[in-house]
Amino acid sequence: WPVLFGALLISSLVIAQVPVVTLGPDFSEPGDGWDKLMQLKNGNTVYLHFSKKDGLLVNIYDTARALKVADTVHAQLWNAADLESTEIDGIFEINGQPVIFLQQLVKYNPVMYRLVLDAETGRLLREDKLGELPSVQHRSVFIDDNLATHDMYVEKDTNSDYYAVALFSGAPIQKTDSVRERIRVLHFSPAHELINSGWFYIPDSSYSYFSYINMAVKGKEKVYLGTVGFNAKRKEGDAGAKVLFSMLSPDSATFAHEVLDYTAGFGNIGGNIQVTGAQVRMLLYVSSKQKEGYTGMMMNTFQAATGKLKKQVQLSFPELSRNMQQNLNYKEEYKGTPQRLHLNEDGSSTLLMESFSFFKQGNSQLNKLHTNLGDIGITLLDTAGRENATLAVSKYQVITGVCEPFQLQRRSKSEWVFRNKIAALNTNTWLSYDYIPVPGVSFVLFNDYLQYLDTGGQDKVRKPLKFAADANFVCYRFYNGKMERLFLFGMPEVTKGYACMMGAADYNAQTRMYATVLISRKGQEKKANIAWIKF
């Protein structure tokens, strides 16, 4: 039943380095919503489709890639019929089971639910309400490019199944409010038991409002939280907004804080926290600081046990800029936005970047802002944050809305908000890219607009990929200093194309298996398959 074929358009490559594709059974193109694949430890592949029409659909494929379950999840607490007031905060495998964290507005109050599914049948095993925030109908507190967060977040430990939930209340503080009970973090075991909870506040009240950056979990031992602390009114002796790195320990109901003084006055900060051994890294990105000779990126290293700052390094990428100048005809430095950080056990890392530019188009208030997702820059950094190797790939896509930094990091755990009522504008799942490193070779994957198919190669003005119907999946292979383009599903033609849902994809580094949803077009006909790509 599955179809097997390899990459066809290859010159003299080592056969072991050729990605091999397995296709599951055909099915109809998914409707508007959100899709996610999970390759479970038991060998099954779970395909979740959040449908605006049918609710949450779950399909399960066995190790032979045959469909063995097709069912609908019937939740009691979460209202599947009201998808437009729902956001996905994370989808993880925990304790061998698919676990889905959803947030939904209930009479304007954000409520978080946890759904646990059976790994064999897809049935709903348990559903719990984890928390609730006050109404979203309030004035935002926005000072010097820092917004008081009013939202909930979930992060899972990458090395275990412990996880944490953060609940941020960001409404203007009233006289009757307890300022020490506005932000709470819940620490859970793999069995979904609450093992600790902590209130997040500054004991000396030097900051009243907080903007969430990121969170990380280290087993049952620690929860780390990055925020920006700021005040609505300037207090005497107030140094302005600063980044805080905070730590919750099992023997405490409150956080210990490390204030990063060098971040005084920073605004609109993006970041990512990851744990490796005895160290914790927090990468910060401040777009306003991205100027000539300065990337706006700072790598901070903390002691995992104490949460104290060990060192702080400003990252720079001269080799990547040289690569861009030599191969993509750049005249100046590459100014990429960080999209995802892969931290290795030894402290070295891989940073995935993408060039962003923003523009306004049209009269609609909802869909006026757009983001160009441009060239790909990837740099492999040593333990000190210096470049070891770089990759540069030309790409041009456009998306409705403003794309934020670390979007690929969030997409990897399926963070998604169902806000766009126009299905044609929901192109996020097709855009940006993926990076697959294996020993001796690496691959960059994305959907491209191959306009030479339309023009016979005459079109000299590059057009961006804007609509899913124009997408064609390409795989760039980097080997021995050379770059080659592969078409894994066959050569695209004017009337024939192959596109993959990047947002639905799941990569298992142990098995080197990449699972995604493939949409094949032949004339006016379309069909979908789960595609497993072995790298």
For each feature predicted by the language model, list its residue ranges.
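Blade-loop segments of beta-propeller domains
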Residues: 26-28, 66-109, 129-146, 198-213, ...
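Bacterial Sec-dependent N-terminal signal peptides
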Residues: 1-21
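Loop/turn-rich, solvent-exposed surfaces of beta-rich toroidal or solenoidal domains
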Residues: 285, 338-341, 348-359, 367-377, ...
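Beta-propeller blade signature
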Residues: 61-63, 112-122, 178-193, 238-253, ...
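Structural signature of eukaryotic scaffold interfaces centered on beta-propeller domains
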Residues: 28-42, 87-96, 142-161, 212-221, ...
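Short, conserved, GDST-rich strand-edge loop motifs in beta-rich repeat architectures
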Residues: 161-181, 228-240, 285-297, 354-372, ...
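Long, internal scaffold/assembly segments composed of regular secondary structure
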Residues: 215-228, 234-370
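Conserved blade-ending motifs and adjacent loop-strand segments that build the rim/top face
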Residues: 257-271, 314-333, 387-433, 470-472, ...
